[in-house]
Amino acid sequence: LGLSLASSKNIYCIDGDGAFLMHMGACAVNGCTGGDNFKYIVLNNGCHESVGGQKTVGFRIHMEAILESCGFAICRAETEAQLRQGIKRLAKQKAALVVYIRPGSRADLGRPTSTPEENKHCFMEAIQA
C-alpha cells in the first residue's frame, strides 16, 4: 500500500489464497485507500501449498465478492487466455485478479537460498530504481 501511494508506478501484490484469507483486514484497507496503481493478484489453489499443502476454504468462498466489496474491480482467470486478458485489464485500473489453479508443485521445486536480510536489500534496491 505504501509503495502505491508513494509512486506513480503500478505496484503488484501477489498472494496465495491462504495469505488472502489470513490478511483480509489488510485487503480491505488496500482496496479502500490504495491508488489506482495498486494491483492485487490472488493465486487460488485451495491450499497452503508452500507449507505442506493443508487445505484452505479458497474454493468455498466468494473471493471475488469480498474483493469487490473492498473497492477492487474484479478479474477472474481459469484459463491461460483469461489470465492474459486479466493481466492486461489490471494494468488499466485498480483491480484484483483471482487466478484459479490446481494444487501441486514440481518434485524438484527448490527453496529460497537468500536470507531475509538479503531479500530486504534486494527489494530496497529495486524500489530505488
Map each language-model feature to its residues:
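Thiamine diphosphate
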Residues: L1-M124
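Charge-patterned, long linear interaction tracts outside catalytic cores
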Residues: Q128-A129
